[in-house]
């Protein structure tokens, strides 16, 4: 487990800023397309921006949890790099979806793939820590010795 989590914290703050920016874009779209709260329907242009932001919000807890677990229990630098790619994928997704529903696919697939990888790395790291802590078996150390 990493003693210093500064890289994970930096990616977390950056991703929080991205979420805030997406929310701001929904506010701007509400003004532009004259959709007043609490309404969430209106022009297709507004609905795409709103839906893109909502999807990002829906996936955000999964991202934060898997980012930190992969960083703490697997490798902070690798998890940080994956986190930055995830943020880029969400950027592609949001702006693609804002233009046309079909343009969201690339960003969605990229960010979903990164989430799957972060989940896998976190699970592997947690499993290794569990085995080391409770069974005195460190798979990662044994693998490092082999290579």
Curated annotation (Swiss-Prot):
Compartments it resides in: Endoplasmic reticulum membrane; Microsome membrane
Gene3D superfamilies with a match to the protein in the record: Membrane associated eicosanoid/glutathione metabolism-like domain
Notes on how activity is controlled: Each monomer can bind on GSH molecule but only one subunit is catalytically active.
EC number: 2.5.1.18, 1.11.1.-, 4.4.1.20
SUPFAM superfamilies from the UniProt entry: MAPEG domain-like
InterPro entries with a match to the protein in the record: 5_LipOase_AP, FLAP/GST2/LTC4S_CS, MAPEG, MAPEG-like_dom_sf, Membr-assoc_MAPEG
GO biological process terms, semicolon-separated: glutathione biosynthetic process; leukotriene biosynthetic process; lipid metabolic process; membrane lipid catabolic process; positive regulation of inflammatory response; response to lipopolysaccharide
UniProt GO MF annotations: enzyme activator activity; glutathione binding; glutathione peroxidase activity; glutathione transferase activity; identical protein binding; leukotriene-C4 synthase activity
Bilayer topology term: Multi-pass membrane protein
Swiss-Prot/TrEMBL catalytic activity: RX + glutathione = an S-substituted glutathione + a halide anion + H(+); 1-chloro-2,4-dinitrobenzene + glutathione = 2,4-dinitrophenyl-S-glutathione + chloride + H(+); leukotriene C4 = leukotriene A4 + glutathione; (5S)-hydroperoxy-(6E,8Z,11Z,14Z)-eicosatetraenoate + 2 glutathione = (5S)-hydroxy-(6E,8Z,11Z,14Z)-eicosatetraenoate + glutathione disulfide + H2O
Induction: Upon ER stress with brefeldin A or with tunicamycin, MGST2 is down-regulated, in several non-haematopoietic cell types, during the early, protective phase of the unfolded protein response (UPR), and up-regulated at the late, death-promoting phase of the unfolded protein response (UPR).
Residue intervals passing through the bilayer: 6-26, 59-79, 111-131
Subunit structure, interactors included: Homotrimer.
Protein name stated in the entry: Microsomal glutathione S-transferase 2
Classification lineage: Eukaryota, Metazoa, Chordata, Craniata, Vertebrata
Chain's gene name: MGST2
């Amino acid at each position: 487990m990493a003693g210093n989590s500064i890289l994970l914290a930096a990616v977390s703050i950056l991703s929080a800023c991205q979420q805030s920016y997406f929310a701001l874009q929904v506010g701007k779209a509400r003004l532009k397309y004259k959709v007043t709260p609490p309404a969430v329907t209106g022009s297709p242009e507004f609905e795409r921006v709103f839906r893109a932001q909502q999807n990002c919000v829906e996936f955000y807890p999964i991202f934060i949890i898997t980012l930190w677990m992969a960083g703490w229990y697997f490798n902070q630098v690798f998890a940080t790099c994956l986190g930055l790619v995830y943020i880029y994928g969400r950027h592609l997704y949001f702006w693609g979806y804002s233009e046309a529903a079909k343009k969201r696919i690339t960003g969605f697939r990229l960010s979903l793939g990164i989430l799957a990888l972060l989940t896998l790395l976190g699970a592997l790291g947690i499993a290794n820590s569990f085995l080391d802590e409770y069974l005195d078996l460190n798979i990662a150390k044994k693998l490092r010795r082999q290579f």
